[in-house]
């Protein structure tokens, strides 16, 4: 996979980390859907998901990216609907 990071509002250190993660791990391509109430429309953004357990190998990355790790709220491990936390990297970071 050839990855070139675009210039975005993300700081350069975070972009370098994203680039390394996408090279080293097998990100899952996905689409994130969100509803814009003021436009009454649903939008879809391409994104990549990386399981957080992969980040456990590199603890400083997990700490650096903590704000980007998505947790499904309202459910606990073992309950219906529980999902392991994952790192979300929006496709617009990548060219």
Predicted regions and their residues:
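General helical structural elements
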Residues: 6, 10, 23, 76-81
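Residue-level detector of alpha-helical secondary structure
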Residues: 15, 19-23, 59-62, 66
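Acidic, low-complexity, intrinsically disordered interaction modules
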Residues: 28-90
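Short acidic DE-rich linear segments
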Residues: 92-95
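Short, extreme N-terminal segment that most often corresponds to the first beta-strand
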Residues: 1-20
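Low-complexity intrinsically disordered segments
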Residues: 5, 27-28
